[in-house]
Amino acid sequence: MKKFTTFLFLVFISIFTISADIAPDTVLTPDSAITFGKLPNGLTYYIRPNSYPENRVFFRLVVKSGSVMEDDDQLGLAHFFEHMAFNGTEKYPGNQVIDFLEKNGIQFGPEINAYTSYDQTVFMLEIPSDKSQLVDQCIEVLGQWAAYVKLEQQDIDDERGVVIEEWRQHQRAEYRLQEFLLDNLFKDSRFAVRNPIGKVKILETFTRDQLVRYYKEWYTPDRMAVMVIGDIDAASVKSSIEKNFSSLKNNPHQRIIDMSVPIEAGTVTGIKTDPEATENQFDMCIKVPFQQNKLAGDYRSYIVRILFCNMMSDRFDQLRRSQNPPFMSANIGFSHLFSSASFFNLGVDLKDNGVREGIEKACNEIARVSQHGFTQTELERAKAELLSLVESLHNEKDKTSSASLINEYTRNFMEDEPIPGIDTEYELYCQYLPLIQLEEVNSFVQNYLKKDGRVLVATGKPQSFGDLTEAS
């Protein structure tokens, strides 16, 4: 990902059907095409036959555990454990997991991978579906990662150099400046001091017991989801999940971690330059309480947010295409800070000789919209474009990729994003889009583009910023 600060607002896709005129208080339940449920130990599963792409199966083990769960002596160990999962389990010691998968034509990197973030660790497999036995074996591998990683001392010591080299890569200017933004965005929260890459001194010196302590406390079935999407038999997959995960036990002494992100009164500002920076960036983030769409009626405000972002994007695109554009590009979106807060993000790539002008133009445009709102013409155009997009997604629903679906189910597990299906979502758009009026959108703008919870951060090259300061 080029920048954490670039957020593209995507219309999410799934597959469920409800009749027209859905009552606003209707709870949006999961798509009936998904075999969805929980084992008695709390493990969640999502199983979904899907034929696009053909003859492929996608697997995920999603764990609600990341760097924010680390103790002060474990900084970086959530990510380190992710590496260790590929270094041997009770049934597949040493490199046998990778050897087994690669012998079946599955490549490490594109089809075998994992990632760790602040609040989650995700293990991913993608396989051809022509060997039904391989599906069961991949579910077994997920089960091994969930509870039976060996964590041999020699393997830990061998892996230190690999992870420390990743840490070194994260010391480049782009990461230093990104961390400055995150420090301001996560100010006064646990996230501000829990970067997933960790602290090098801890990576160099931690003991096996510290790593085992993290694994045993946070890798529990009530914090896990298993997802299998693709060319599969759902009943067989469910049976295999039950076989490999039902015996897993929870930790009765697991702690509750404060994962809140404060929404400050007023505006937080920051400027940071770096002699190794290669570009200049301005970010405006506005934090608001976490917003969900659990009920059908919630979709109306959700659609208003989409229209707002799309119309703001059009405004900034017009500035970019002007005769003397004040910046090179701008990205606008709406996203979540985990399950703690939601936020609007404007990210602007600034010209070397126009940092001050670019920031001023961006802030002035936000102020103009806040004061005067949008026009009826802008709203009608945005509504027509959004409806056209949703119609296209609905018409092409049989070509919804398994990768897209599994990403959506991951968001459902981590953020409670509803997964009712594209049929239901299409009905909701058709139901609510015609009802949304300009006054409603502009009222949303007035309430949303406020100074509380606002974070303004500019980063880049010293020579481009000159004497620009936060006060100026």
What residue ranges belong to the model's regions?
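Positively charged n-region of N-terminal signal peptides that target proteins for export
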Residues: 1-4
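Bacterial N-terminal signal peptides
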Residues: 6-16
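Proteolytic maturation boundary segments
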Residues: 20-47, 225, 233-289, 293-298, ...
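Active-site-adjacent, His/Asp/Glu-enriched structural segments that form or flank metal-binding
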Residues: 54, 63-176, 195, 205-223, ...
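Scaffold signal of the M16-like zinc-metallopeptidase fold and its non-catalytic homologs
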Residues: 87-89, 110, 114, 118, ...
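Acidic/histidine-enriched alpha-helical segments
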Residues: 94, 98-102, 150-168, 179, ...
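Structured mid-domain segments that build the active-site/substrate or prosthetic-cofactor binding neighborhood
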Residues: 284, 289, 293-294, 298-376
